[in-house]
Swiss-Prot record:
EC number assigned by the record: 2.8.4.3
Cofactor: binding details: Binds 2 [4Fe-4S] clusters. One cluster is coordinated with 3 cysteines and an exchangeable S-adenosyl-L-methionine.
Cofactor(s) the record lists: [4Fe-4S] cluster
Spans through the membrane: none
Domain Radical SAM core: residue ranges: 143-374
SMART domains attached to this UniProt entry: Elp3
Domain MTTase N-terminal: 4-120
Species lineage: Bacteria, Bacillati, Actinomycetota, Actinomycetes, Frankiales
Protein name as it appears in the record: tRNA-2-methylthio-N(6)-dimethylallyladenosine synthase
Source species of the chain: Frankia alni (strain DSM 45986 / CECT 9034 / ACN14a)
Keyword terms of this UniProt record: 4Fe-4S, Cytoplasm, Iron, Iron-sulfur, Metal-binding, S-adenosyl-L-methionine, Transferase, tRNA processing
Record's subcellular location: Cytoplasm
HAMAP family reported for this sequence: tRNA_metthiotr_MiaB
Amino acid sequence: MTGRSYEVRTFGCQMNVHDSERLSGLLESAGYVPAPPGSEADVVVFNTCAVRENADNRLYGNLGQLVPVKKGHPGMQIAVGGCLAQKDRSTILDRAPWVDVVFGTHNLHRLPVLLERARHNAAAELEIAEALEVFPSSLPTRRASHHSAWVSISVGCDNTCTFCIVPSLRGRERDRRPGDVLAEVEALVGEGALEITLLGQNVNSYGRSLGDPGAFAKLLLACGRVDGLERVRFTSPHPRDFTDDVIEAMAATPNVCHQLHMPLQSGSDDVLRRMRRSYRRDRFLGIVERVRAAMPDAAITTDIIVGFPGETEADFADTLDVVRQARFAGAFTFQYSPRPGTPAATMDGQIDRTTVAERYARLVALQDEVSWAQNRELVGRRVELLVAEGEGRKDDATGRLSGRARDGRLVHFRAGAGLAARPGDVVETVVTRAAPHHLTADGPLLSHRRTRAGDAWELARTAPVPAAGDGAGTTAARQTVALGMPSVGPAPSPGRR
Protein backbone atom coordinates (compact mmCIF):
# COMPACT_ATOMS: atom_id res chain seq x y z
CA MET A 1 0.00 0.00 0.00
CA THR A 2 1.43 3.40 -0.99
CA GLY A 3 0.34 7.00 -0.80
CA ARG A 4 -0.45 6.86 2.92
CA SER A 5 0.68 9.79 5.06
CA TYR A 6 3.17 9.58 7.92
CA GLU A 7 4.56 11.59 10.82
CA VAL A 8 7.73 10.88 12.82
CA ARG A 9 7.91 12.24 16.38
CA THR A 10 11.41 12.36 17.83
CA PHE A 11 12.46 12.30 21.48
CA GLY A 12 16.09 12.52 22.59
CA CYS A 13 19.54 13.22 21.23
CA GLN A 14 21.10 14.11 17.89
CA MET A 15 21.44 10.40 17.11
CA ASN A 16 17.67 10.08 17.29
CA VAL A 17 17.16 13.17 15.16
CA HIS A 18 19.37 11.67 12.46
CA ASP A 19 17.71 8.25 12.81
CA SER A 20 14.35 9.96 12.29
CA GLU A 21 15.64 11.40 9.01
CA ARG A 22 16.38 7.82 7.97
CA LEU A 23 12.97 6.57 9.09
CA SER A 24 11.37 9.33 7.01
CA GLY A 25 13.53 8.38 4.03
CA LEU A 26 12.60 4.72 4.36
CA LEU A 27 8.90 5.52 4.51
CA GLU A 28 9.01 7.85 1.52
CA SER A 29 11.00 5.31 -0.48
CA ALA A 30 8.21 2.84 0.31
CA GLY A 31 5.60 5.26 -1.05
CA TYR A 32 4.44 7.10 2.06
CA VAL A 33 4.12 10.90 2.01
CA PRO A 34 4.62 13.43 4.83
CA ALA A 35 1.37 14.34 6.55
CA PRO A 36 0.43 17.99 5.92
CA PRO A 37 0.74 20.21 9.02
CA GLY A 38 -2.31 19.98 11.24
CA SER A 39 -3.61 16.78 9.69
CA GLU A 40 -3.94 13.31 11.17
CA ALA A 41 -1.29 11.01 9.73
CA ASP A 42 -2.12 7.47 8.63
CA VAL A 43 1.11 6.29 10.28
CA VAL A 44 2.64 7.86 13.41
CA VAL A 45 6.16 6.74 14.34
CA PHE A 46 7.68 7.50 17.74
CA ASN A 47 11.49 7.47 17.83
CA THR A 48 12.13 7.22 21.55
CA CYS A 49 14.82 8.00 24.11
CA ALA A 50 15.69 5.96 27.20
CA VAL A 51 18.14 8.44 28.71
CA ARG A 52 16.04 11.48 29.56
CA GLU A 53 14.12 11.70 32.80
CA ASN A 54 10.54 10.43 32.54
CA ALA A 55 11.15 9.22 28.97
CA ASP A 56 8.63 6.41 29.41
CA ASN A 57 5.97 8.71 30.88
CA ARG A 58 6.36 11.03 27.93
CA LEU A 59 5.96 8.18 25.45
CA TYR A 60 2.92 6.62 27.09
CA GLY A 61 1.31 10.01 27.55
CA ASN A 62 1.63 10.65 23.83
CA LEU A 63 0.41 7.16 22.99
CA GLY A 64 -2.61 7.63 25.22
CA GLN A 65 -3.57 10.82 23.39
CA LEU A 66 -3.72 8.84 20.14
CA VAL A 67 -6.31 6.31 21.37
CA PRO A 68 -9.38 8.41 20.40
CA VAL A 69 -7.62 9.58 17.24
CA LYS A 70 -7.02 6.02 16.11
CA LYS A 71 -10.61 5.00 16.88
CA GLY A 72 -11.82 7.73 14.54
CA HIS A 73 -9.20 7.04 11.86
CA PRO A 74 -9.72 3.58 10.31
CA GLY A 75 -6.47 1.99 9.19
CA MET A 76 -4.24 4.27 11.26
CA GLN A 77 -1.03 2.64 12.49
CA ILE A 78 1.29 3.52 15.38
CA ALA A 79 4.92 2.40 15.52
CA VAL A 80 7.39 2.77 18.40
CA GLY A 81 11.14 2.52 17.83
CA GLY A 82 14.39 3.81 19.28
CA CYS A 83 16.15 3.25 22.59
CA LEU A 84 13.08 2.85 24.81
CA ALA A 85 11.67 0.28 22.39
CA GLN A 86 14.99 -1.60 22.42
CA LYS A 87 14.86 -1.62 26.23
CA ASP A 88 11.18 -2.24 26.98
CA ARG A 89 10.25 -4.47 24.02
CA SER A 90 6.96 -6.30 24.69
CA THR A 91 6.23 -4.06 27.68
CA ILE A 92 5.20 -1.38 25.20
CA LEU A 93 2.51 -3.65 23.74
CA ASP A 94 1.40 -4.66 27.24
CA ARG A 95 0.97 -1.04 28.32
CA ALA A 96 -0.30 0.27 24.96
CA PRO A 97 -1.99 -2.59 23.08
CA TRP A 98 -3.17 -0.18 20.39
CA VAL A 99 0.42 0.09 19.11
CA ASP A 100 0.93 -1.78 15.82
CA VAL A 101 4.73 -2.05 15.49
CA VAL A 102 7.64 -2.09 17.95
CA PHE A 103 11.18 -2.07 16.52
CA GLY A 104 14.60 -1.33 17.97
CA THR A 105 17.79 0.61 17.31
CA HIS A 106 19.43 -2.11 15.20
CA ASN A 107 16.70 -2.73 12.61
CA LEU A 108 15.43 0.66 11.44
CA HIS A 109 15.39 -0.63 7.87
CA ARG A 110 12.61 -3.09 8.74
CA LEU A 111 9.98 -0.44 9.54
CA PRO A 112 8.13 -0.43 6.17
CA VAL A 113 7.99 -4.25 6.11
CA LEU A 114 6.75 -4.42 9.70
CA LEU A 115 4.04 -1.85 9.04
CA GLU A 116 2.80 -3.76 6.00
CA ARG A 117 2.91 -7.09 7.86
CA ALA A 118 0.96 -5.65 10.80
CA ARG A 119 -1.62 -4.20 8.42
CA HIS A 120 -1.97 -7.44 6.47
CA ASN A 121 -2.20 -9.68 9.54
CA ALA A 122 -4.23 -7.21 11.63
CA ALA A 123 -1.88 -7.97 14.53
CA ALA A 124 0.95 -6.14 16.26
CA GLU A 125 4.52 -6.78 15.10
CA LEU A 126 7.38 -6.85 17.63
CA GLU A 127 10.88 -7.21 16.18
CA ILE A 128 14.01 -6.34 18.17
CA ALA A 129 17.44 -7.21 16.76
CA GLU A 130 20.34 -7.85 19.13
CA ALA A 131 23.01 -6.48 16.80
CA LEU A 132 23.21 -4.00 13.96
CA GLU A 133 21.90 -5.56 10.75
CA VAL A 134 22.45 -2.74 8.26
CA PHE A 135 24.75 0.24 8.82
CA PRO A 136 22.27 3.14 9.08
CA SER A 137 24.20 5.43 6.74
CA SER A 138 23.38 3.14 3.82
CA LEU A 139 19.65 3.77 4.28
CA PRO A 140 17.51 6.32 2.41
CA THR A 141 17.47 9.62 4.27
CA ARG A 142 15.06 12.53 4.17
CA ARG A 143 17.19 15.43 5.38
CA ALA A 144 15.40 17.90 7.62
CA SER A 145 17.60 20.76 6.38
CA HIS A 146 18.87 21.79 2.96
CA HIS A 147 21.91 23.62 4.33
CA SER A 148 23.04 21.52 7.29
CA ALA A 149 23.38 17.75 7.62
CA TRP A 150 24.38 15.09 10.11
CA VAL A 151 26.97 12.55 8.99
CA SER A 152 27.46 9.52 11.22
CA ILE A 153 31.05 8.38 11.54
CA SER A 154 30.31 5.61 14.04
CA VAL A 155 27.48 3.90 15.87
CA GLY A 156 27.41 2.42 19.35
CA CYS A 157 29.60 3.07 22.37
CA ASP A 158 32.31 1.14 24.23
CA ASN A 159 32.22 3.26 27.39
CA THR A 160 30.70 2.02 30.64
CA CYS A 161 29.44 5.17 32.37
CA THR A 162 27.40 4.04 35.36
CA PHE A 163 24.53 6.47 34.68
CA CYS A 164 24.09 5.63 30.99
CA ILE A 165 22.10 2.87 29.34
CA VAL A 166 23.06 3.75 25.76
CA PRO A 167 25.80 1.10 25.23
CA SER A 168 23.38 -1.71 26.07
CA LEU A 169 20.83 -0.30 23.62
CA ARG A 170 23.06 0.91 20.77
CA GLY A 171 25.68 -1.83 20.96
CA ARG A 172 29.46 -1.77 20.70
CA GLU A 173 31.15 1.00 18.75
CA ARG A 174 31.50 0.41 15.02
CA ASP A 175 33.35 2.87 12.80
CA ARG A 176 32.65 3.70 9.19
CA ARG A 177 35.60 3.76 6.85
CA PRO A 178 36.93 7.28 6.20
CA GLY A 179 36.35 6.96 2.46
CA ASP A 180 32.68 6.19 3.03
CA VAL A 181 32.29 9.15 5.38
CA LEU A 182 33.96 11.51 2.91
CA ALA A 183 31.86 10.16 0.04
CA GLU A 184 28.72 11.07 1.96
CA VAL A 185 30.11 14.51 2.86
CA GLU A 186 31.02 15.22 -0.77
CA ALA A 187 27.61 14.05 -1.98
CA LEU A 188 25.82 16.31 0.50
CA VAL A 189 27.93 19.31 -0.46
CA GLY A 190 27.24 18.51 -4.10
CA GLU A 191 23.54 18.76 -3.29
CA GLY A 192 23.99 22.20 -1.67
CA ALA A 193 24.81 21.54 2.00
CA LEU A 194 27.12 24.15 3.53
CA GLU A 195 27.50 22.65 7.00
CA ILE A 196 28.25 19.11 8.16
CA THR A 197 28.17 17.77 11.71
CA LEU A 198 30.17 14.59 12.23
CA LEU A 199 28.17 12.46 14.63
CA GLY A 200 29.03 9.66 17.04
CA GLN A 201 28.55 8.65 20.66
CA ASN A 202 32.29 9.27 21.10
CA VAL A 203 33.69 10.84 17.95
CA ASN A 204 37.30 11.07 19.03
CA SER A 205 37.61 7.35 19.64
CA TYR A 206 36.88 7.06 15.92
CA GLY A 207 39.42 4.86 14.18
CA ARG A 208 40.10 2.54 17.08
CA SER A 209 38.26 -0.35 15.43
CA LEU A 210 40.08 0.48 12.18
CA GLY A 211 43.49 0.26 13.82
CA ASP A 212 44.16 3.99 13.38
CA PRO A 213 43.91 5.99 16.62
CA GLY A 214 44.64 9.23 14.75
CA ALA A 215 41.80 8.75 12.28
CA PHE A 216 39.53 11.47 13.65
CA ALA A 217 42.10 14.24 13.28
CA LYS A 218 42.84 12.99 9.76
CA LEU A 219 39.11 13.04 8.98
CA LEU A 220 38.84 16.68 10.06
CA LEU A 221 41.78 17.59 7.83
CA ALA A 222 40.19 15.70 4.92
CA CYS A 223 36.90 17.57 5.40
CA GLY A 224 38.93 20.76 5.07
CA ARG A 225 39.78 19.74 1.50
CA VAL A 226 36.14 19.33 0.39
CA ASP A 227 35.35 22.19 -2.00
CA GLY A 228 32.20 24.07 -1.06
CA LEU A 229 32.03 22.79 2.51
CA GLU A 230 31.97 25.94 4.65
CA ARG A 231 31.41 24.63 8.18
CA VAL A 232 32.39 21.41 9.93
CA ARG A 233 31.26 20.57 13.45
CA PHE A 234 31.35 17.38 15.50
CA THR A 235 29.63 15.91 18.54
CA SER A 236 30.35 14.56 21.04
CA PRO A 237 33.92 13.88 22.14
CA HIS A 238 34.94 12.14 25.36
CA PRO A 239 37.60 13.92 27.44
CA ARG A 240 39.45 10.64 27.99
CA ASP A 241 40.14 10.27 24.26
CA PHE A 242 40.67 13.94 23.41
CA THR A 243 44.17 14.27 21.95
CA ASP A 244 46.28 17.20 20.84
CA ASP A 245 46.23 16.13 17.18
CA VAL A 246 42.49 16.92 17.15
CA ILE A 247 43.13 20.39 18.56
CA GLU A 248 45.83 20.95 15.93
CA ALA A 249 43.49 19.78 13.15
CA MET A 250 40.71 22.09 14.38
CA ALA A 251 43.05 25.08 14.46
CA ALA A 252 44.65 24.30 11.09
CA THR A 253 41.48 23.60 9.09
CA PRO A 254 39.64 26.80 8.09
CA ASN A 255 36.21 25.24 7.70
CA VAL A 256 36.26 23.44 11.06
CA CYS A 257 34.28 25.66 13.42
CA HIS A 258 35.91 26.85 16.61
CA GLN A 259 33.21 25.21 18.68
CA LEU A 260 33.63 22.31 21.07
CA HIS A 261 30.93 20.47 22.97
CA MET A 262 32.72 18.30 25.54
CA PRO A 263 30.71 16.71 28.38
CA LEU A 264 32.07 17.39 31.87
CA GLN A 265 29.27 15.63 33.82
CA SER A 266 30.86 16.58 37.17
CA GLY A 267 33.73 18.69 38.46
CA SER A 268 34.38 16.33 41.36
CA ASP A 269 37.00 13.62 40.96
CA ASP A 270 35.14 11.43 43.44
CA VAL A 271 31.90 11.71 41.46
CA LEU A 272 33.70 11.17 38.15
CA ARG A 273 35.18 7.99 39.61
CA ARG A 274 31.73 6.72 40.62
CA MET A 275 30.43 7.68 37.19
CA ARG A 276 33.29 5.64 35.68
CA ARG A 277 34.22 8.55 33.41
CA SER A 278 37.95 7.63 33.08
CA TYR A 279 39.26 11.21 33.42
CA ARG A 280 39.56 13.76 36.21
CA ARG A 281 38.90 17.49 36.46
CA ASP A 282 42.53 18.50 35.84
CA ARG A 283 42.60 16.61 32.54
CA PHE A 284 39.34 18.26 31.49
CA LEU A 285 40.58 21.74 32.36
CA GLY A 286 43.87 21.00 30.61
CA ILE A 287 42.02 20.25 27.37
CA VAL A 288 40.04 23.48 27.72
CA GLU A 289 43.27 25.42 28.25
CA ARG A 290 44.95 23.89 25.19
CA VAL A 291 41.90 24.46 23.00
CA ARG A 292 41.78 28.14 23.98
CA ALA A 293 45.54 28.51 23.45
CA ALA A 294 45.16 27.22 19.89
CA MET A 295 41.80 28.94 19.21
CA PRO A 296 41.22 31.92 21.51
CA ASP A 297 37.76 32.48 20.03
CA ALA A 298 36.56 28.91 20.68
CA ALA A 299 33.10 28.51 22.21
CA ILE A 300 33.14 25.54 24.57
CA THR A 301 29.90 23.97 25.80
CA THR A 302 29.28 20.98 28.03
CA ASP A 303 26.89 18.58 29.78
CA ILE A 304 26.60 18.49 33.58
CA ILE A 305 24.64 16.14 35.83
CA VAL A 306 23.58 17.39 39.27
CA GLY A 307 22.74 15.13 42.17
CA PHE A 308 24.54 11.95 41.16
CA PRO A 309 24.41 9.34 43.96
CA GLY A 310 26.83 10.21 46.73
CA GLU A 311 27.41 13.78 45.55
CA THR A 312 28.23 15.91 48.59
CA GLU A 313 28.02 19.67 48.91
CA ALA A 314 31.82 19.71 48.52
CA ASP A 315 31.54 17.67 45.30
CA PHE A 316 28.96 20.10 43.96
CA ALA A 317 31.21 23.03 44.90
CA ASP A 318 33.94 21.40 42.78
CA THR A 319 31.55 21.39 39.82
CA LEU A 320 30.76 25.08 40.29
CA ASP A 321 34.50 25.77 40.46
CA VAL A 322 35.11 24.05 37.11
CA VAL A 323 32.24 26.04 35.55
CA ARG A 324 33.94 29.26 36.68
CA GLN A 325 37.37 28.17 35.44
CA ALA A 326 36.24 26.68 32.12
CA ARG A 327 33.98 29.65 31.26
CA PHE A 328 31.57 27.55 29.22
CA ALA A 329 29.62 29.36 26.52
CA GLY A 330 26.67 27.20 27.49
CA ALA A 331 25.76 23.98 29.24
CA PHE A 332 23.10 21.30 29.02
CA THR A 333 22.33 20.71 32.69
CA PHE A 334 20.44 17.72 34.05
CA GLN A 335 19.03 16.65 37.38
CA TYR A 336 20.11 13.07 37.95
CA SER A 337 17.33 10.52 37.85
CA PRO A 338 17.85 6.76 38.23
CA ARG A 339 17.59 4.84 34.98
CA PRO A 340 16.63 1.18 35.49
CA GLY A 341 19.33 -1.13 34.20
CA THR A 342 22.24 1.18 35.04
CA PRO A 343 24.69 0.61 37.93
CA ALA A 344 24.00 4.09 39.31
CA ALA A 345 20.33 3.28 39.84
CA THR A 346 21.19 0.92 42.70
CA MET A 347 24.09 2.87 44.22
CA ASP A 348 24.01 3.97 47.83
CA GLY A 349 23.64 7.67 48.51
CA GLN A 350 20.65 8.51 46.30
CA ILE A 351 19.97 12.21 46.89
CA ASP A 352 16.56 13.62 47.71
CA ARG A 353 14.82 15.59 44.95
CA THR A 354 14.68 18.81 46.97
CA THR A 355 18.47 18.92 47.36
CA VAL A 356 18.99 18.04 43.69
CA ALA A 357 16.60 20.79 42.56
CA GLU A 358 18.28 23.36 44.81
CA ARG A 359 21.75 22.52 43.48
CA TYR A 360 20.43 22.52 39.94
CA ALA A 361 19.04 26.04 40.36
CA ARG A 362 22.40 27.27 41.66
CA LEU A 363 24.26 25.67 38.76
CA VAL A 364 21.92 27.15 36.15
CA ALA A 365 22.20 30.60 37.74
CA LEU A 366 26.01 30.44 37.67
CA GLN A 367 26.16 29.15 34.10
CA ASP A 368 23.76 31.88 32.94
CA GLU A 369 26.02 34.44 34.58
CA VAL A 370 29.10 33.00 32.85
CA SER A 371 27.37 32.75 29.47
CA TRP A 372 25.97 36.26 29.68
CA ALA A 373 29.38 37.72 30.55
CA GLN A 374 30.91 36.05 27.48
CA ASN A 375 28.07 37.15 25.23
CA ARG A 376 28.34 40.78 26.38
CA GLU A 377 31.95 40.76 25.16
CA LEU A 378 30.62 40.10 21.64
CA VAL A 379 28.47 43.25 21.44
CA GLY A 380 29.82 45.35 18.58
CA ARG A 381 31.44 42.30 16.95
CA ARG A 382 30.84 41.47 13.30
CA VAL A 383 29.50 37.92 12.86
CA GLU A 384 28.83 35.63 9.92
CA LEU A 385 25.54 33.75 10.24
CA LEU A 386 24.16 30.72 8.49
CA VAL A 387 20.44 31.50 8.42
CA ALA A 388 18.39 28.79 10.12
CA GLU A 389 14.74 27.85 10.27
CA GLY A 390 12.78 27.38 13.48
CA GLU A 391 15.60 28.50 15.79
CA GLY A 392 13.89 31.66 17.04
CA ARG A 393 10.58 31.02 18.80
CA LYS A 394 9.63 34.71 18.67
CA ASP A 395 10.87 35.49 15.15
CA ASP A 396 7.37 36.03 13.75
CA ALA A 397 6.43 38.40 16.58
CA THR A 398 9.69 40.37 16.51
CA GLY A 399 10.15 40.53 12.75
CA ARG A 400 13.57 38.96 13.08
CA LEU A 401 15.26 35.96 11.53
CA SER A 402 17.73 33.68 13.29
CA GLY A 403 21.04 32.10 12.42
CA ARG A 404 24.06 30.39 13.87
CA ALA A 405 27.46 32.04 14.09
CA ARG A 406 30.51 29.97 13.27
CA ASP A 407 31.04 29.30 16.97
CA GLY A 408 27.50 27.94 17.26
CA ARG A 409 25.95 30.89 19.07
CA LEU A 410 22.35 31.71 18.21
CA VAL A 411 21.84 35.23 16.80
CA HIS A 412 18.49 36.89 16.09
CA PHE A 413 18.82 39.57 13.39
CA ARG A 414 16.78 42.03 11.36
CA ALA A 415 15.96 40.73 7.90
CA GLY A 416 16.83 44.00 6.17
CA ALA A 417 15.54 45.50 2.94
CA GLY A 418 15.59 43.92 -0.51
CA LEU A 419 15.63 40.18 -1.05
CA ALA A 420 14.87 38.46 2.26
CA ALA A 421 17.45 36.13 3.72
CA ARG A 422 16.33 32.51 3.56
CA PRO A 423 17.34 29.46 5.60
CA GLY A 424 20.62 28.35 4.06
CA ASP A 425 21.72 31.84 3.04
CA VAL A 426 24.77 33.46 4.65
CA VAL A 427 24.64 36.97 6.11
CA GLU A 428 26.95 39.25 8.06
CA THR A 429 25.80 41.66 10.73
CA VAL A 430 26.93 43.31 13.98
CA VAL A 431 25.84 42.15 17.44
CA THR A 432 23.91 44.89 19.25
CA ARG A 433 22.66 43.13 22.40
CA ALA A 434 23.49 40.08 24.49
CA ALA A 435 21.48 37.67 26.62
CA PRO A 436 22.62 34.49 28.37
CA HIS A 437 21.41 32.16 25.61
CA HIS A 438 21.42 34.28 22.46
CA LEU A 439 22.65 37.43 20.76
CA THR A 440 20.66 40.09 18.93
CA ALA A 441 21.72 42.10 15.88
CA ASP A 442 19.24 44.89 15.13
CA GLY A 443 21.42 46.86 12.72
CA PRO A 444 21.44 46.58 8.93
CA LEU A 445 22.91 43.54 7.22
CA LEU A 446 26.48 44.13 6.10
CA SER A 447 26.28 41.39 3.48
CA HIS A 448 23.87 38.75 2.21
CA ARG A 449 24.97 35.80 0.09
CA ARG A 450 22.22 33.77 -1.53
CA THR A 451 23.02 30.07 -1.74
CA ARG A 452 21.81 26.92 -3.48
CA ALA A 453 20.61 25.70 -0.09
CA GLY A 454 18.44 28.80 0.19
CA ASP A 455 17.14 28.20 -3.34
CA ALA A 456 16.22 24.63 -2.36
CA TRP A 457 14.42 25.83 0.78
CA GLU A 458 12.45 28.37 -1.25
CA LEU A 459 11.52 25.77 -3.86
CA ALA A 460 10.35 23.31 -1.21
CA ARG A 461 8.30 26.01 0.49
CA THR A 462 6.47 27.02 -2.68
CA ALA A 463 5.94 23.48 -4.00
CA PRO A 464 2.43 22.05 -3.55
CA VAL A 465 1.97 19.80 -0.53
CA PRO A 466 1.48 16.22 -1.75
CA ALA A 467 -1.81 14.64 -0.82
CA ALA A 468 -2.06 11.12 0.56
CA GLY A 469 -3.04 8.76 -2.22
CA ASP A 470 -1.94 11.22 -4.92
CA GLY A 471 0.61 9.41 -7.07
CA ALA A 472 2.08 12.63 -8.43
CA GLY A 473 2.39 14.01 -4.95
CA THR A 474 4.14 10.88 -3.81
CA THR A 475 6.72 11.25 -6.56
CA ALA A 476 7.33 14.87 -5.67
CA ALA A 477 7.85 14.03 -2.03
CA ARG A 478 10.30 11.27 -2.82
CA GLN A 479 12.55 13.62 -4.76
CA THR A 480 13.75 15.00 -1.42
CA VAL A 481 15.08 11.60 -0.33
CA ALA A 482 18.75 10.72 -0.73
CA LEU A 483 18.98 7.02 -1.51
CA GLY A 484 21.70 6.14 0.94
CA MET A 485 25.43 6.73 0.89
CA PRO A 486 27.25 6.48 -2.44
CA SER A 487 29.78 3.65 -2.34
CA VAL A 488 31.94 4.74 -5.27
CA GLY A 489 32.23 7.62 -7.68
CA PRO A 490 32.43 11.39 -7.35
CA ALA A 491 29.90 13.60 -5.68
CA PRO A 492 27.14 14.81 -8.00
CA SER A 493 27.94 18.12 -9.62
CA PRO A 494 25.70 21.15 -9.02
CA GLY A 495 24.20 20.68 -12.47
CA ARG A 496 23.19 17.07 -11.82
CA ARG A 497 20.77 17.58 -8.95
